[in-house]
A protein has these predicted regions:
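Start-transfer (signal-anchor) and selected internal transmembrane alpha helices
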Residues: 1-28, 219
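Membrane-interface helix-boundary motifs at transmembrane edges
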Residues: 2-8, 108-116, 160-167, 205-213
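Transmembrane catalytic cores of multi-pass membrane glycosyltransferases
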Residues: 23-72, 80-96, 103, 126-129, ...
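Hydrophobic, membrane-inserted alpha-helices
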Residues: 74-76, 101-102, 125-129, 171-177
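Transmembrane-helix signature of membrane-embedded glycosylation machinery that interfaces
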Residues: 92-95, 104-113, 155, 159
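Membrane-interface micro-motifs in multi-pass membrane enzymes
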Residues: 116-159, 182
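Short hydrophobic alpha-helices at membrane interfaces in multi-pass membrane enzymes
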Residues: 119-121, 157-179, 208-218
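Specific aromatic-rich, kink-prone transmembrane helix
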Residues: 143-163, 172-176, 195-201
């Protein structure tokens, strides 16, 4: 896999566009009883309820903390703008799911030379959502996919432009902080992966010294911890603003 230089692959871009429209259409499914499957309305209710709680200003407690993360905080302002409307919330979810796929298509465009492989990769990425038309599993799409795709696209752009510096690294950890806030386990994995990317670059940079490697590992370990505790702090600032005790790490 190499960074591709040729442009104007209009047929590939047309396929991206068609898939993007189909993905949005498939994910915009506000009728949670449409397939008459209990899992659909259970999944939809669980996800929306945790967002609606934050919209109403409820603090996170041991009984109200969502098992999927604290994504409700990132939905709070958009939900205020639409008055907590469920129909508009589904549109937001469809938009996020579509954005995750667009990021995946752009990663393919930046990193894969073969047109056939790019098309096959795009179809494969879209297949899970297109294959469950009318179904609900927001807990995976877009929930556990949006930030991995954003970070992967960001890394691909850095590779394309060779923008490797302190600030680009910190921007990656900012994305990881938001990812941890959104969904804890996914965000922590992304932060560790972002650290591993810089460590691997250190090892691949020709001659390297053990001192440089140790310093790189330590600096990025601190950044991973800062991403985690930054997200933890944001949750507790929200709780304190609602006159509720701070959450423990266990909560």
């Amino acid at each position: 896999i190499q960074i591709r230089e040729e442009k104007n692959d209009w047929m590939v871009w047309l396929i991206y566009a068609v898939l993007t429209i189909l993905i949005f259409y498939c994910m915009d499914t506000p009728n949670i009883f449409g397939r008459a499957e209990a899992g659909d309305h259970f999944h939809a209710h669980a996800y929306y309820n945790s967002v609606y709680n934050v919209y109403q200003g409820l603090p996170y407690t041991d009984t109200l903390t969502s098992i999927y993360g604290h994504y409700g905080l990132l939905f709070k302002i958009p939900m205020k703008l639409v008055g907590g409307d469920f129909r508009m919330f589904v549109l937001m979810i469809a938009g996020l799911g579509t954005l995750a796929h667009v990021c995946a298509f752009l990663v393919l465009e930046l990193t894969v030379e073969s047109r056939i492989l790019r098309v096959l990769g795009a179809v494969a990425a879209a297949f899970p959502v297109l294959g469950m038309r009318g179904g609900y599993y927001w807990q995976v799409w877009p929930h556990r996919m949006i930030f991995p795709m954003i970070l992967l696209l960001y890394a691909a752009i850095l590779m394309k432009k060779q923008w490797w510096n302190v600030w680009s690294g910190l921007a990656g950890y900012l994305i990881c902080l938001l990812a941890i806030l959104w969904n804890t386990e996914t965000g922590v994995i992304l932060a560790v992966a972002w650290m591993a990317l810089f460590v691997s670059r250190c090892l691949a940079g020709g001659e390297w010294r053990i001192g440089l490697l140790i310093r790189t590992v330590l600096v990025h370990a601190v950044c991973v911890a800062a991403s985690f505790f930054g997200a933890y702090g944001i949750v507790n600032l929200y709780n304190l603003s609602k006159h509720s005790p701070a959450n423990t790490l266990g909560e």
